[in-house]
A protein has these predicted regions:
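Acyl-donor (CoA/ACP) binding surface of acyl/acetyltransferases
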Residues: 1-18, 23-32, 65, 69-180
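Bulky hydrophobic/aromatic packing residues
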Residues: 29, 37, 59-60, 165
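Conserved GNAT-fold acetyl-CoA-binding loop/helix
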Residues: 31-52
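A short helix-loop-beta-strand connector motif used in the catalytic cores of GNAT acetyltransferases and
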Residues: 39-40, 52-67
Length: 180
């Protein structure tokens, strides 16, 4: 695989229809490892409202929402969020991502996560980023490990997925810069 098969950028209002299509197309796949989304999540209007809110969140340093685009044609194939932003002495956040199942296994998610981590460290000056993944989703754990995250432990009964509380593997990456 050659370098740079995908790129990330902040989501824009014009992305609502394409994001909705990605979520609809992958609903069954995403629901295996994610909290159940309300029906409205799969509407263009809801995605548009999320994008509008994401701009305010970014300005107020609360959350950063990106889309993952295939470099060849610019098509949106996924999304990545930096959320649960904590400043002050912690300077950390949590990363979450989803990628169209048709593009899994090609290294695209790892590449996109690396790009967002670089931005988070260099531009946003985070000290630490945490990622969590279901032990039933070894592919997601591998994404984080390949992006430089290290395992820290298991968060017991952490997230309710499909009506059942599940454990999650906790991984983190530390900014190597001393200038934070």
């Amino acid at each position: 695989m050659s370098e740079q098969q995908v790129y990330v950028r902040f989501s824009e209002e014009a992305d609502a229809a394409e994001l909705t299509a990605v979520y609809k197309r992958n609903r069954e796949f995403f629901d295996k490892f994610s909290p159940i989304s309300l029906e409205e999540h799969y509407t263009e209007e809801h995605q548009l409202q999320k994008i509008i809110k994401s701009k305010a969140d970014r300005i107020e340093d609360r959350k950063y929402s990106f889309v993952v685009c295939h470099k060849e044609d610019g098509r949106i194939i996924g999304s990545i969020d930096l959320s649960f932003v904590v400043r002050g002495p912690l300077q950390n956040c949590m990363i979450g991502y989803s990628l169209d199942q048709a593009y899994n296994g090609k290294g695209y998610t790892t590449e996109a996560v690396k790009q967002v981590v670089r931005y988070a460290f260099e531009e946003l000056k985070f000290h630490r980023i945490v990622g969590e993944a279901s032990p039933r989703n070894p592919g997601s754990i591998r994404v984080l490990e390949k992006a430089g995250f290290h395992k820290e432990g298991i968060s017991r009964s952490n997230v309710k997925i499909n009506g059942k509380w599940e454990d999650h593997q906790v991984l983190a990456i530390i900014n190597p810069s001393e200038d934070i």
